[in-house]
Swiss-Prot record:
Its EC number is 2.1.1.242. One of its GO terms (cellular component) is cytoplasm. The keyword S-adenosyl-L-methionine applies. Specifically methylates the guanosine in position 1516 of 16S rRNA. GO terms for molecular function: rRNA (guanine-N2-)-methyltransferase activity. This is Ribosomal RNA small subunit methyltransferase J.
Length: 248
């Protein structure tokens, strides 16, 4: 894949070269999207809109740290949707990992989560965030145990992954109406990079065939059900809906 590769002063240029080789990235200075190695992390920038800033994965500080420490924990909608109860902590495959936020919430509660990501740049960002989290004194030990990245297409993983998970979680890219600064920023950068998940409807059937317990699909509250298939049940929040489907 062609993308502009930049190394900031103080960062390791050889590390950027190794990263490009690992993920099959080819430097192209004409590309709008830039993958930038800073002295502290890897981030994605949309060069024609510098005010959007960089997008990167951070499980240690910022929003995710606050959510881990002060969020709803088992009371979060995603936790309810996957079926967490008392001593039951399902094994989860997040087949559309993205920045790994919901996967992190589930892992912080105690679930083992295998994250599947097919886009090389997004996978590189996610791996960078995981590596830094693995080294953290507070969360590193359980992060290494509970959060793993699989670089593969969702369709491929849903037919080949082993062992079989209790829950398959899907959060396909969908156009957002909200004007939230965070969502607007990330959606504009991400959609410029990966576009919409136009094959998302085709993931529901293999997900239902794979899961031992249930499939959970996160949707904006205004969106139709995935594949136009009515859900068995739903957990709703202010802006989203977690549709629940039984396994086949």
């Amino acid at each position: 894949m062609n993308i502009c590769l930049l190394c900031e002063e103080g960062a390791d240029n050889s590390a950027l070269s190794a990263l490009a080789q690992r993920w099959g990235l080819i430097h192209d200075a004409t590309q709008t999207m830039a993958l930038v190695l800073t002295p502290t992390h890897l981030e994605l920038r949309k060069q024609d809109e510098p005010k959007l800033g960089g997008i990167y994965v951070d499980f240690v500080a910022g929003t995710m740290a606050h959510r881990r420490k002060f969020g709803g924990g088992r009371g979060e909608a995603v936790a309810k949707a996957v079926g967490i109860k008392k001593d039951y902590l399902p094994d989860v495959v997040d087949a559309t990992a993205g920045l790994g936020r919901d996967a992190f919430v589930l892992a912080s509660i105690g679930c083992n989560v295998r994250m599947v990501e097919r886009h090389p740049v997004v996978a590189a960002l996610l791996e960078d965030g995981l590596k830094r989290a693995y080294l953290d004194a507070d969360i590193g030990e359980w992060m290494q145990q509970r959060m793993k990245l699989i670089y593969a297409s969702s369709a491929q993983a849903l037919t080949q992954i082993s062992p079989t998970p209790d829950v398959v979680y899907l959060d396909p890219m969908y156009p957002h109406k909200t004007k939230s600064a965070l969502v607007k920023k990330e959606m504009r950068v991400f959609q410029s990079l990966v576009g919409a998940d136009e094959d998302a409807d085709a993931l529901l059937a293999p997900a239902m065939a794979l899961a031992k317990k249930r499939v959970v699909v996160k949707r904006p509250d205004y969106a139709e059900p995935l594949n136009n298939q009515p859900a068995h049940a739903s957990v709703t929040t202010k802006n989203h809906r977690f549709d629940i489907y039984p396994c086949i």
